[in-house]
């Protein structure tokens, strides 16, 4: 039987990888079997669109003015959400994103049978809120405003993240940028949302956007035995490995999430569903720091032949928010639900996760108040 996928550009590349696989993933080469399988899955399987409807629901998306966050916000609006909140660092860019959503879907009603509810015009169904993930005060203010103005959320998609090209000057709190935004600030935001009861219990969903490639991280014995992995990867490296730093930040985030999900009942009575998703290899603006002709050419090739479209990657962010109890503490990717699997060499995974959670909370407490789990 002919496979339609073979006639897609991605399918052609997949077939080429099938033919050359023994060479590409031979022992001691830079492409691991696990990396290959993730890459192959991205090439072969388009993701399904969301089977859910957000009618009557309030949805928060952070990092929502561009990339995956924008597409997730657009989809939420298109699924008839009562209220979509865009959490953005730059309010002006957030307002521009809001206008793009309204222009793209000007006639989307609140539900399949009505065009307004409570007399609210369509434009009032999207709010833009300032959220600077490098500033703890901004995160506190953001959550306080949510709790005061919006009532409990039905869905919170914690998408905001960075991928540093080089070792950035330390944040105001003394942390490398990937660690600050992807780990510490995201952790603080999640804890404050839970503590403020800003997400509906039991049926609400708190979603972390992660990366399953964090499983490819191989910690050295020195790193594993260090008092704090945060401190280890906060040091200025002689040769900064941007890709490894990003994956380490996602490893720490997933470890934090894994521990948080097991303890969430201690934080608020009737916890929301806490889950994590991975959109796979897809086009986004995370690589915007890579500049120059070579970077532009590589980006064009990857975008054309390899990566999922941003819209397709955002489908995972939306389908991951289906409020099912079995999603709590698990990992959604490629339209399937998986157990959270950390790298093989971290030892006892729950013990590792619990230690990371405590390290993260300790680091945040040096600079701001944070709920204790």
Sequence positions of predicted segments:
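C-terminal helix/juxtamembrane-tail motif
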Residues: 355-373
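Short aromatic-enriched loop/helix-cap "lid" or pocket-rim segments at secondary-structure transitions
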Residues: 218-222, 286-291, 342-346
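C-terminal helical subdomain
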Residues: 300-342, 350-352
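Alpha-helical membrane-targeting segments
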Residues: 1-41, 236-243, 281-312
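Short, hydrophobic alpha-helical segments
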Residues: 197, 321-325, 364, 368
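Non-transmembrane alpha-helical segments in soluble domains
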Residues: 257-261, 318, 357, 361
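An acidic site on a long C-lobe helix of protein kinase domains
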Residues: 135, 252, 309-312, 352, ...
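Rossmann-fold NAD(P)H-dependent dehydrogenase/reductase core
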Residues: 30-285, 370-371
């Amino acid at each position: 039987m002919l496979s339609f996928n073979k006639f897609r550009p991605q399918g052609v590349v997949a077939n080429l990888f099938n033919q050359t696989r023994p060479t590409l993933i031979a022992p001691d080469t830079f492409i691991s079997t696990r990396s290959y399988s993730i890459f192959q899955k991205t090439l072969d399987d388009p993701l399904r669109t969301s089977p859910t409807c957000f009618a009557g629901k309030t949805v928060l998306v952070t990092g929502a003015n561009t990339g995956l966050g924008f597409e997730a916000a657009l989809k939420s609006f298109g699924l008839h959400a009562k209220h979509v909140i865009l959490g953005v660092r730059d309010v002006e860019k957030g307002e521009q994103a809001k206008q793009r959503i309204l222009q793209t879907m000007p006639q989307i009603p609140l539900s399949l049978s009505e065009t307004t509810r409570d007399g609210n015009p369509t434009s009032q169904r999207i709010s833009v809120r300032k959220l600077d993930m490098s500033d703890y005060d901004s995160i506190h203010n953001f959550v306080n405003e949510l709790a005061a103005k919006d009532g409990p959320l039905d869905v919170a998609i914690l998408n905001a993240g960075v991928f540093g090209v080089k070792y950035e000057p330390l944040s105001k709190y003394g942390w490398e940028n990937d660690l600050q935004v992807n780990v510490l600030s995201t952790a603080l935001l999640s804890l404050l949302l839970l503590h403020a009861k800003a997400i509906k219990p039991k049926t609400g969903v708190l979603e972390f956007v992660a990366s399953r490639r964090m499983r490819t991280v191989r910690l050295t014995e020195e790193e594993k035995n260090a008092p704090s992995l945060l401190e280890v990867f906060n040091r200025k490296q002689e040769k900064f490995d941007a890709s490894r730093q990003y994956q380490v930040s996602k490893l720490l985030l997933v470890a934090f999430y894994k521990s948080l999900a097991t303890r969430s009942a201690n934080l608020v009575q009737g916890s929301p569903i806490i889950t994590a998703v991975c959109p796979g290899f897809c086009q986004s603006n995370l690589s915007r720091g890579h500049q120059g002709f070579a970077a532009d050419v590589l980006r064009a090739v990857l975008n054309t032949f390899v990566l999922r479209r941003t819209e397709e990657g955002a489908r995972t962010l939306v389908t991951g928010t289906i409020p099912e109890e079995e999603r709590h503490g698990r990992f959604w990717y490629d339209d399937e639900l998986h157990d959270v699997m950390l790298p093989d060499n971290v030892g006892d995974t729950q013990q590792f996760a619990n230690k990371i959670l405590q390290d993260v909370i300790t680091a945040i407490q040096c600079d701001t108040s944070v709920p204790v789990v």
